[in-house]
Structure formats: C-alpha cells, structure tokens
Amino acid sequence: MVREEEKSRWWWFESHKSSKHSQWLQSTLAEIDAKTKAMLKLLDGNADSFAQRAETYYKKRPELISFVEDFYRAHRSLAVNFDHLKSSDHYGSRSAKVPQQSMESVCDSNSHFEDADSEIEDPLQDDASAADCKEDETWQLEQERLKLIEETDALRKQLLDKDEEKREVIRQLSLTLETLKDENLSLKRRLAHHSLKQRTVLEFKPLNKFFGKLFYIMCDGNKVL
C-alpha cells in the first residue's frame, strides 16, 4: 500500500533534500513539504457514505484553497529569487570583461610584468570558480523551479479529480433524495386511501345495526298480524 502511494506521488517523494541548498531555499522547501503533506492528508480522507464524503469535502474546501494560495506564494517567491540571481550573474559576467581586457593590453606592451601577470591569474581563477558555483546554483534553482511546476500541476489535477468525485457524490445524493420523495409521496397516498376505506366501513356499521333492528321489528309485527 505504501509503495503504491509512493509510486503515485513520485513528484513529491524524490525532491528537495540536499545539503548543497542555501538556508533560505531549504527553509522554503521545508515549508512547501509541510503544506504538501497537509494537503495530501486532506485529499486522502475517506468516508463510509456519500453523505459523509460530501460533508467532508465542503468542510475541507476552504482549507485546501488556503493551502493552494500558500503554495502559489512559495512558488512565486522561488521564481522571483531565481530571476534576480540570474540577472545578477549576467551583470557580473559583463563587468568582468573590462579588467580582463586591460590586463591583456598591459601584458602585450610590457613584457617585464609576466611574473606579476602570473600572480594576478589566481584571483581570476577564483572568480571563474565562483562563477561556476553560481552557475551550478542557478541550474539547481532552475531544476527546483521545474519540479515545483510539475508538483503544482500534479496537485491541481488531483484537486480537479477530487472535485469531480465530490460532484458525483452530490449527484448521487440528489437522485437518492428524489427517490425518497417519490416513495414517501406514494406511501402517503396509500395510507390516505386505506384510511378512507376504513372510515367508510366504520360509518356503515351503525347503519347495518339499525336496519337489522328495523327488519327484526317488522318481522315481529307481521307475526302478530
């Protein structure tokens, strides 16, 4: 049962946990994980009858909407930070070209500064390493952004499926109520008809007794004559 659940939620069980992430990214992803767990717990709630399932859905719907709003804000925050980091990298790569060109011109005009030039190469290499690290972090953020998009789409699909299921529950309840109304109306008509027949029989009983006595008196009178 657990393995089937993990397979159906591959988009969530395979994500996020890495020591290479920044503290802010780890905090954001941990918050998203907590929201995802809570949403899945709400979506997986089962009930024994159509009525209970419909009632549960309408009770949990505001909470689900709140979770989706939080999910959207977290996703938007990641996207904004990713775009900001990408823009910063672009600006840094352009500004780094100026000192590099100046260094090349100095080396061409003054051969005496070869040793000094070799000493200056170390910070440039450090800058290149830092740029590579930024590129790696940018790539990781891009992968996380794509994963978040997949997670959001999968969650939206799951919510739509649940909505359709709840609508089907409501349709079934409506049909059941209509059937009960028809049966109740039919039962009332039968009871009214049966009550009318009983009343008619009770009304005729005194008349039968009266006519019986009258017939008896008339018979006695004929005997006397």
Curated annotation (Swiss-Prot):
Cell membrane: present as a keyword of the record? yes
A GO CC annotation given for this chain: endoplasmic reticulum membrane
Task: List each copy of the NAB domain by range.
Answer: 8-89
Q: Where in the cell is it found?
A: Cytoplasm; Endoplasmic reticulum membrane; Cell membrane
Give UniProt keywords alphabetically. Answer: Cell membrane, Coiled coil, Cytoplasm, Endoplasmic reticulum, Membrane
Q: Which GO terms describe its molecular function?
A: actin binding
InterPro entries the UniProt entry points to: NAB, NET_actin-binding_domain
Where are the annotated coiled coils located? 139-197
Query: Mutating F211A: what's the consequence?
Result: Increased association with F-actin and distorted ER network
Source domain of life: Eukaryota
What does the entry's domain section say?
Answer: The C-terminus is involved in oligomerization and is essential for membrane association. The NAB domain, also called NAB (NET actin-binding) domain, is involved in F-actin binding.
Q: Which family does it belong to?
A: Belongs to the NET family.
Per the entry, what this protein does is:
Plant-specific actin binding protein. Part of a membrane-cytoskeletal adapter complex that forms a bridge between the endoplasmic reticulum and the plasma membrane.
Subunit structure as annotated in this protein's UniProt entry: Dimer or oligomer. Interacts with PVA11/VAP27.
Name used for this protein in its record: Protein NETWORKED 3C
Taxonomy, top ranks, is:
Eukaryota, Viridiplantae, Streptophyta, Embryophyta, Tracheophyta
Originating gene: NET3C
